[in-house]
Structure formats: C-alpha cells, structure tokens
C-alpha cells in the first residue's frame, strides 16, 4: 500500500476570534465577467505562505495521511484516482475555496473527526472540477470521516458560479455535519466576516431517500437533516418553512454584529447608496428590535472591478460613522489600527470595545482570487497574493497554471521566528511596522509604491494573457511560472526600496521631500498631529500647554 503525507497549502496556527474576511462577486456583477472571491487570513503569531501540490493520477489502493494543521494523529484515507494541481486556494480548473470561522454552538464540535476545515478545503480542491462538485466532495468527506472544526462559512467558486456554504458538526462521537449552500445570483455581491449569515433558504417538498443532501432548482443545496437535527438538539421547534440556519446554529450577539457584520456592511456601503446602508447602523449596535438585519447579498449600483475589490480588502471604515481615524484613539497620526484586545475595560470598570475592520495588522496573508471563463484555465485563474496586512502590501498576480511557487512565498522562507530579507512575509512586515506608528505621515509613500506595482501588473498581465494563446500547454506552464516569479521579485525589490525610503525620508520624525520613490534635496517639514488628537490633548491637559498672549 502506497502512502502519501498530505502537505497543506499554508502553514497556519490557531487564530484569534473574529478573524478572516471573504468578499464574493458574481460574474455579472464584475466589469469583465470574472467571478471573484477574497481571503484576509487573520491571526496573530503565524506567517502565511503559498503552497503548490502537483496534479497526479494515482494507483488503486493508494492512501493519503491527513494531518491537521493543529497537530495530532495522522489518519489514512484512500486517494482519489486523479487529483488536480492546487496553487494556494485555487486549483487548475479555476475552483477556489476560502473561509471564515463563525464557531457557533460549542457543543457541536467533534474532536474525534478527521477533517478540520482547512484540510477539508485542500482535499476538495484536489478532487473537484466545479464549485458544485467541491460542495458535494466536502459533504461526502465529513459524512465518512467526521469534522473536527467549529462552525465555518466557505465561499466555493469557479469560473461560472459563486456559492456560499455554511457548515457545522454534530458533536462528540457523531460523524457528518449539517450545512446549507446557496448560489450567489450572478449580478450580486456578498461577504462573510466570522458570522453565520444564511437564515431561511429554499426547500424541497420531499427529501430524496438515497441521498444525504437536497438540491433546490440548482440554486440551493443542504444536508437532508439540517432541520431535523436542530429539532433533535432543541435549537428549533417551529415549522420547516420558517427555519433559519443562523438562528439555530450560530445566533447573533453584540460581538457578531459589531465586529463581524459591520465588515459586511462597510463592503456593501462601497457599492450601493451609503445612506441606504446607514439605515442599518442600529443593527450594528445590536438593536435588533428597531432595525432589520443586513441582506444576504445585494446588487451593486455599478459593476465591480478587481482593483475595487483590492481596495475593499484594505477598508478601515473610512468616511463612515465607524471611521477609526477620526477620534483620539487614532493617536497623533490618525491611525486606523488598534492594539488587542477587542474588548477592554476603563479604569473605572466601564466595559469598552474597539472596531474590527476588514484591513488589520494581524493578517498573515491576503488574496483576491479571480476566475475567468473567457480565458483558458491556466491563465484564466489568477490569485492576487501577498503575506501580511492587505492595506500594507501590493497584490502580486499568481496564475493557477504555474508549476512551482516563487521563493519569497514558500513556507521554508517565511519562518515566524526568524527575520529574512528573502521572505515576503518579513519584508512586508518590515515596511508595515514602520508605517503603523506614524500612519498619516508615511502611508502616502506606501500607497505610491502599492499603486505603482499594481498598475504595472495590470498592464503587463494584458500582454501575458495575449501571448498565452500561442503557447503549448508545457510552454504556457513554464511561461506563467517565470512571469509569476518575476512579479514576485519585482515586489520584493520595490518593498526593499520603500523600506530604505521610509527610514531616510522620515528619520527623527521629520519629513524630507521625495520624488519617484527617492529622497530629493530640499527643506524638510514637520508633519502636524491629527486635529482630533490636538483637541483631545487640549481638553485633557487644560492650561498646561497654552501659549500666553504676546
């Protein structure tokens, strides 16, 4: 019997609560017909990486050993006859799966299950040619071997369709999971941010006898026992027609709306009438009695570009009622970043909180997955990727048709405990951690470098994709691998240049003039503190710093 140890696509550690964000765009909602899904993978204390698993045809009787990214005993399961190549979280057929954790009812976690959510995603990508197939593969695997993570939402997408799937286990000693998956209408957008969001869903009149799942007009799928199990556990007692998955398995509370649904709200607000979305502000305060909940999806006012989505991944509620740069807690440099924890107490015991935006310093990696049915798979699927906070990096195009990963993104070069200039994670963090403490003074230099790179990639990709049509499959794989490595090297060089600029330009808390990424001759200036901070200092210190009249 042949055995293979499964290599995970990313190295992960346990992440903090309220971690990870997904934005999802249907093909008719995007400007060019792309299906788009994104992933900010957030959590302190881990460095992400980009992995690659090669395609393969496997012998009968071949086994693979599942080893959870959290450690523990390895379990053997039969290998599939054929497995697809996977780059990051997209396979060679342009199928992508991303996730956010919403936990849900703690008693439903099954520690004896063999599949955690990340291993489940990885195996499904290796075995699925479409999003629909991936959903059914995930269901089959947890039914057979058990599921040991908490409640999860998955965006399961291919070049034609985007699906959202919510899944939670059945508790200790019980294999399987209860789940619902809904197809995102092609002309809509949606988002997930660590809360369960599917409530009522279309249902069949009579469940099939031989299958463990139901399909409703190709737009909804769900486990056959999703309602009966909730009744068994005492989570629901009403009629089937009024059943809400979220209310049964992942009920809302203040944290779920303010730290999670607020991120969805901000994304929607970018793409529809802001005033209409501001009507949901009472919901973000958990005032459920006076305000409706957010819709599951919306139709954007105008079609969405992939660059718009990159910008959305960097959101800190700027320009909204939740703007993090506009009060004293933003500090002297109008920072949208805050230290942990999310919840804290004042010296008098008053309970307080801070906002939790889409863009955050604890991101280990960020990606925007773009699937295009109008291009051949190897070049149609591209993941815009980098390691660290989306706000502080440039997205590097990584084609799904490559055959190896660029060195700076490899796991062995991104050790959380050892700085290296050859590590994308550490080069991006090196720059970000210079900018964080003096945000308003330095962010303009970073945005300039970010835009320069992403503009270049956007233009160069047009040439790459035009040339791809004339190449054989082998030539195309080599070409895309080389171009992806060149793109990554360009990012690393530009970020090294940016780091050197920041220390020279902003040395000793002044600001020297610069042009085209280099310091120029001229008189330095001293950047002013944020007005809100100055006013707060004046109010707090009284007459101490008031200058006398002259």
Residue ranges and their predicted role:
Residues 447-550:
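Histidine-centered catalytic/metal-binding microenvironments
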Residues 330-468:
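Substrate-recognition/cap regions that form aromatic- and gly/pro-loop-enriched pockets
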Residues 20-117, 137-301:
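A contiguous strand-loop segment
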Residues 264-352, 356-358, 463-464:
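Accessory, solvent-exposed terminal regions and/or long lumenal/extracellular loops of proteins
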Residues 7-15:
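Bacterial N-terminal signal peptides
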């Amino acid at each position: 019997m042949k055995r293979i140890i499964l290599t995970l696509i990313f190295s992960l550690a346990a992440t903090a609560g309220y971690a990870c964000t997904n934005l999802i765009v249907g093909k008719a909602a995007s400007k060019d017909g792309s299906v788009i899904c994104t992933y900010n993978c957030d959590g302190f204390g881990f460095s992400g990486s980009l992995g690659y698993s090669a395609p393969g045809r496997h012998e009968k009787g071949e086994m693979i050993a599942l080893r959870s990214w959290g450690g523990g005993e390895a379990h053997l399961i039969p290998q599939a006859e054929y497995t697809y190549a996977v780059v990051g979280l997209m396979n060679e057929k342009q199928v992508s799966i991303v996730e956010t954790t919403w936990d849900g009812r703690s008693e439903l976690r099954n520690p004896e299950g063999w599949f955690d959510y990340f291993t489940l995603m990885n195996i499904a990508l290796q075995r699925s040619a479409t999003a629909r197939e991936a959903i059914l593969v995930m269901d089959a695997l947890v039914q057979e071997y058990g599921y040991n993570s908490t409640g999860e939402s998955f965006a399961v997408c291919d070049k034609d369709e985007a699906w959202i799937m919510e899944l939670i286990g059945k508790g200790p000693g019980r294999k399987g999971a209860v789940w619902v998956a809904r197809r995102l209408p092609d002309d809509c957008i949606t988002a997930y941010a660590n809360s369960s969001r599917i409530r009522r869903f279309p249902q069949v009149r009579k469940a099939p006898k031989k299958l463990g799942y139901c399909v409703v007009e190709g737009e909804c799928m769900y486990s056959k026992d999703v309602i009966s199990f909730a009744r068994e556990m005492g989570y629901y007692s009403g009629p089937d027609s009024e059943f809400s998955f979220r209310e049964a398995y992942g009920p809302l509370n203040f944290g779920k709306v303010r730290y999670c649904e607020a991120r969805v709200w901000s994304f929607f607000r970018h793409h529809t009438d802001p005033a209409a979305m501001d009507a949901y502000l009472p919901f973000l305060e958990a005032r459920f009695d006076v305000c409706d909940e957010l819709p599951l999806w919306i139709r954007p006012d105008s079609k969405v570009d992939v660059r718009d989505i990159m910008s959305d991944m960097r959101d800190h509620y700027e320009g909204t009622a939740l703007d993090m740069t506009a009060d004293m807690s933003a500090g002297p440099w109008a920072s949208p970043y805050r230290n942990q924890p999310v919840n804290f107490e004042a010296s008098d015991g008053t309970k307080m909180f801070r906002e939790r935006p889409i863009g955050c310093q604890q991101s280990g990696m960020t990606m925007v997955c773009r699937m295009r049915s109008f291009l051949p798979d190897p070049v149609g699927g591209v993941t815009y990727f980098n390691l660290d906070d989306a706000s502080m990096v440039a997205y590097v195009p990584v084609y799904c048709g490559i055959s190896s990963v660029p060195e700076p993104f490899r796991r062995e070069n991104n050790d959380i405990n050892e700085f290296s200039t050859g590590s994308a994670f550490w080069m991006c963090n090196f720059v970000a951690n210079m900018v964080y403490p003096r945000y308003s003074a330095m962010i303009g230099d970073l945005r300039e470098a970010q835009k320069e790179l992403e503009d270049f990639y956007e233009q160069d990709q047009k040439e790459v994709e035009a040339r791809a049509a004339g190449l054989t499959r082998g030539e195309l794989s080599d070409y895309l691998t080389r171009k992806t490595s060149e793109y990554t090297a360009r990012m690393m060089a530009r970020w090294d240049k940016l780091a050197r600029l920041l220390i020279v330009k902003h040395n000793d808390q002044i600001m020297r003039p610069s042009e085209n990424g280099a310091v120029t001759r001229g008189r330095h200036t001293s950047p002013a503190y944020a007005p809100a901070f100055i006013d707060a200092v004046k109010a707090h210190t009284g007459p101490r710093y008031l200058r006398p009249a002259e």
